[in-house]
């Protein structure tokens, strides 16, 4: 058994309620845990500059900002850097099961996971969890920014906000989008958009300032994808484009030597059918993927340059 720790800091403003600001600080180390998407990962350092040094730096910067600015906010702040996220949200789950503060006094939780690769052309910022409190969407729509914001209502997702949502706490998760370096040694500091991350943090500050004008947020459950119920025995070796808003599952990158690459799938293809499942979005794709096992062969249909292409893929 390997033990690890969550790192927690508390800013006491003498307020009734507390805002939690968090990010995971773990990554993939030397590529030995089978989570790497590199073709030959073992022994290669995976620094995880975007995933998730960017979020960890965001926690530290917001802690510095709120500790030094004047006047005091109407909230206390709990800053947390979680361990064990890559292995299954272990750090945030452990904290939520053994909190150091009264959770009935937590107003909401903000999670930052991969906020360091803002695309300067699209300016896409994805915000998950907007359905977890009635005030989130009107507030986000009200705040002026240069971002092209994609809102996702679900409280459950593949990052640490999920642990807090499951404790009936409103959440937001900020994400600048997927990229070809995800879970690879090439996710390094030279590719971080520092100015873009600064803008994301300034936007989060605006969100927090807006919530100061409101009563304690009201939690509401959302319709969530059943990601936790599925078990995956196979992978295609491709990267979904989570910011894609069209019909189908847009491929952001394809890993060389994996089933998708061998079948002829390319970056930019849009998967519209996998096996017997029509794919309208990423969740449909994941649902289809969960039905296969190693050495299965199935048909996959993609749209490429406006034309449908059929091909066979073997897992």
PLM features: what roles do these ranges have?
Residues 272, 287-315:
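PDZ-domain C-terminal substructure recognizer with occasional recognition of PDZ-binding tails
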Residues 57, 64, 68, 180-226:
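His/Asp/Glu-rich mid-to-C-terminal helical/loop segments that flank catalytic regions of hydrolases
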Residues 72-80, 109-112, 211-230:
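Acidic/histidine-enriched alpha-helical segments
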Residues 21, 59, 238, 260, ...:
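Terminal peptide-recognition signature
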Residues 222-267:
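PDZ/PDZ-like groove recognition
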Residues 14-16, 82-173, 193-195:
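Metal-dependent peptidase/peptidase-like ectodomains
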Residues 1-47, 61-64, 68-74:
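Soluble metallo-hydrolase cores and metallopeptidase-like ectodomains found primarily
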Residues 260-282:
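Conserved PDZ fold ligand-binding element
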């Amino acid at each position: 058994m390997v033990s690890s720790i969550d790192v927690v800091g508390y800013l006491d403003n003498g307020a009734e309620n507390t805002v939690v600001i968090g990010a995971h600080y773990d990554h993939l180390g030397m590529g030995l845990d089978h989570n790497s998407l590199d073709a030959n990962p073992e022994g290669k350092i995976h620094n995880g500059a975007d995933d998730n040094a960017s979020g960890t730096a965001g926690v530290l910067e917001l802690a510095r900002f709120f500790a030094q600015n004047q006047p005091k906010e109407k909230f206390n702040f709990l800053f947390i850097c979680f361990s064990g996220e890559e292995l299954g949200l272990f750090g945030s789950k452990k904290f939520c099961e053994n909190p150091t503060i009264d959770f009935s006094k937590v107003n909401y939780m903000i999670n930052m996971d991969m906020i360091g690769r803002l695309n300067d052309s699209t300016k896409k910022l994805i915000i998950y969890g907007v359905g977890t409190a009635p005030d989130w969407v009107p507030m986000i729509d009200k705040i002026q920014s240069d971002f092209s914001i994609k809102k996702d209502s679900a409280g459950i997702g593949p990052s640490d906000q999920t642990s807090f949502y499951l404790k009936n706490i409103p959440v937001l998760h900020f994400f600048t989008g997927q990229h070809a370096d995800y879970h690879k040694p090439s996710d390094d500091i030279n590719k971080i958009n520092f100015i873009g991350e600064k803008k994301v943090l300034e936007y989060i500050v605006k969100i927090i300032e807006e919530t100061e004008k409101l009563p304690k947020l009201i939690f509401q459950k959302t319709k969530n994808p059943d990601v936790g119920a599925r078990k995956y025995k196979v992978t295609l070796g491709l990267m979904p484009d989570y910011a894609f808003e069209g019909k189908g599952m847009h491929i952001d990158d394809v890993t060389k030597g994996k089933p998708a690459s061998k079948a002829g799938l390319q970056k930019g293809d849009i998967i519209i059918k996998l096996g017997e499942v029509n794919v309208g979005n990423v969740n449909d794709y994941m649902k289809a993927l969960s039905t296969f096992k190693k050495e299965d062969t199935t048909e996959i249909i993609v749209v490429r340059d406006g034309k449908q292409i059929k091909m066979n893929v073997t897992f």
